[in-house]
From Swiss-Prot:
Main function: Induces CD27-mediated apoptosis. Inhibits BCL2L1 isoform Bcl-x(L) anti-apoptotic activity. Inhibits activation of NF-kappa-B and promotes T-cell receptor-mediated apoptosis.
Molecular function terms from GO: CD27 receptor binding; tumor necrosis factor receptor binding; virus receptor activity; zinc ion binding
Modified residues (Phosphotyrosine): Y34
Subunit structure: Binds through its N-terminal region to the C-terminus of CD27 and to PXMP2/PMP22. Binds to the C-terminus of TNFRSF18/GITR. Binds to BCL2L1/BCLX isoform Bcl-x(L) but not to BAX.
Coiled-coil ranges per UniProt: none
Tissue-by-tissue expression: In post-ischemic kidney, found in cells lining the S3 segment of proximal tubules at 12 hours and 1 day post-ischemia. At five and seven days post-ischemia, found in epithelial cells of papillary proliferations in regenerating tubules.
Free-text remark on how the cofactor is bound: Binds 3 Zn(2+) ions.
The organism's place on the tree of life at top rank: Eukaryota
Species, as recorded: Rattus norvegicus (Rat)
Pfam families xrefs: Siva
Keywords: Apoptosis, Cytoplasm, Metal-binding, Nucleus, Phosphoprotein, Zinc
Subcellular location(s) of the protein: Cytoplasm; Nucleus
Induction (free text): By ischemia.
Taxonomic placement: Eukaryota, Metazoa, Chordata, Craniata, Vertebrata
Protein encoded by which gene: Siva1
Protein name per the record: Apoptosis regulatory protein Siva
Amino acid sequence: MPKRSCPFTDAAPLQLKVHVSPRELSHGVFAERYSREVFERTKQLLFQGAQAYRDHIWGEGCSINHLPEPLKPGLVGAPQAARGQMLIGPDGRLTRCQAQASEAGLPGAAPIACSSCVRSVDGKAVCSQCERALCGQCVYTCWGCGALACVLCGLADYADDDDGEKTLCTSCAMFEA
């Protein structure tokens, strides 16, 4: 007597090899871990490149003729970071550039105007979100974290309770909503 066939042929899944591309990896179950690995690898490569540039490991064959005059080595003065740009510190951690905030205290420098009301800035108050200079009347303190915020980056929260108006920075406003 011959063997009978399996009655569940339609329900049985095909057992084929499936190619998993990087796109499926980055959007799949391990998306967070995969993106963290890519971020750490990229940060490490950037840090190694910054260290190599700072320690002058690049050989003499490397051409730097395409750099503008203020950035060529041997000239006095460090390159200025763009507003809001973060720098890699000697320990590999990202730090905010404090050059814009310290420029207000330089003697002989032109007075900086407030970004909201265009008054002369009396202190060194800087918005923690956009790093714009602020005067004493335009600075708001975040109710959640205590950071300084400007009119554009601060969010007024009118609650039902007796506290009245609370100002939140954009980071804290995401969690309050």
